[in-house]
Regions:
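Canonical Rossmann dinucleotide-binding motif of NAD(H)/NADP(H)-dependent dehydrogenases/reductases
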Residues: 2-40
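Amphipathic alpha-helical dimer-interface segment in Rossmann-like NAD(P)H-dependent oxidoreductases
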Residues: 123-143, 152-154, 188-189, 193, ...
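Short C-terminal tail/terminal secondary-structure segment
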Residues: 256-257, 268-288
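Short, small/polar-rich loop/turn modules that mediate ligand/substrate recognition or access, typified
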Residues: 192, 197, 267-269
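A conserved structural motif in NAD(P)-dependent oxidoreductases
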Residues: 225-230, 240-252
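Catalytic Tyr-X3-Lys loop
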Residues: 97, 105, 113-132, 146, ...
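Catalytic loop of short-chain dehydrogenase/reductase
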Residues: 105-109, 146-193, 204-207
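Conserved mid-core segment of classical short-chain dehydrogenase/reductases
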Residues: 48-56, 104-119, 157-165, 169, ...
Length: 288
């Protein structure tokens, strides 16, 4: 029997990357999936986002695991449209047990207009809140909410550093992830009497389309005009404690599975870092 057998999971940003990986693993462990993605680009985010055919492929992979998939094209910035999409998915499957607020962008390009800050915050912070708050009415005791943060949330200088190297979008990304960490803490306290768990996962560099994009390469290698993947990967390990360039989406999915499963039934309000020791490089020990 799978670790989330008989459960229904809602995942935003599910068309590719970490979201697709989460959908596939949760399906392999017995969950039906409500997969949501915007499936179109956002102007200030200079790498291409997923397309409808990517979302279809996620559904195919879920069904290949023997589970049901309900797909919705929706923008997490639009709470009303998102709520309607979630309602349709829950109407089809009859319940909702797991919420994974995964959708995110990282418009790290120097010289972008201030709108890039707004877009990053709208997706990475308000989008998380919109998904979760549109889902709460469907949840019950034992349900699990998981928000995707970032190791940037723990960097004291993340906003300044990202703002310098990645423009206003990089600053917005770092700011949003910091507030997500605080939000998860406070929401976990709020929902504890209902026995609904709320946790955050904070990845480091992850091997997805977001990382492997010209704007991100440039953010890591501002000394080069048009850095290649190979040139960027030389400095990727500086973020981690381990001498590796990035973790894999599946590494994050295993953490999602744990937090979604009954193995974590008393785990709430946690900031789970899947960062290959990145936090240890930037934060001195200050006691438990």
């Amino acid at each position: 029997v799978g670790r989330v057998a008989g459960k229904v999971a809602l995942i935003s940003g599910a068309a590719r990357g970490q979201g697709r990986s989460h959908a596939r693993l949760l399906a392999a462990e017995g969950a039906d999936i409500i997969a949501v993605d915007i499936c179109e680009d956002i102007e200030t985010n200079e790498y291409p986002l997923a397309r409808p055919e990517d979302l279809d492929e996620t559904a195919r992979l879920v069904e290949k695991e023997g589970q049901r998939a309900h797909t919705e094209i929706a923008d997490v910035r639009d709470r009303a449209a998102l709520a309607a999409a979630i309602d349709r998915g829950v109407a089809e499957f009859g319940q909702l047990d797991i919420v994974v607020a995964n959708a995110g962008i990282c418009p790290m390009t120097a010289g972008l207009p201030p709108q890039a800050f707004v877009d990053a915050v709208d997706v990475d912070l308000l989008g998380v809140m919109n998904l979760i708050h549109a889902s709460i009415k469907h949840l019950h005791a034992g349900a699990s909410i998981i928000a995707t943060g970032s190791v940037a949330a723990f960097m004291a200088t993340a906003v300044n550093t990202a703002g310098m190297d990645g423009g206003p979008g990089g600053a917005g990304y770092a700011f949003a992830k910091q507030v997500v960490a605080h939000y998860v803490n406070d929401l976990a306290r709020t929902l504890a009497p209902e026995q609904i768990r709320v946790n955050a996962i904070h990845p480091t560099n992850c091997n997805t389309d977001m990382l492997h994009s010209p704007p991100m390469y440039k953010a890591f290698r501002p000394d080069l005009q048009n850095p290649t993947r190979e040139e960027a990967e030389v400095v990727f390990p500086m973020i981690q404690g381990f001498p590796i360039p990035y973790v894999e989406p599946e590494d994050i999915s295993e953490a999602v599975l744990f937090l979604a499963s009954d193995a974590a039934r008393y785990v709430t309000g946690q900031q789970l870092r899947v960062d290959a020791g990145g936090f240890l490089k930037i934060k001195p020990w200050s006691g438990p």
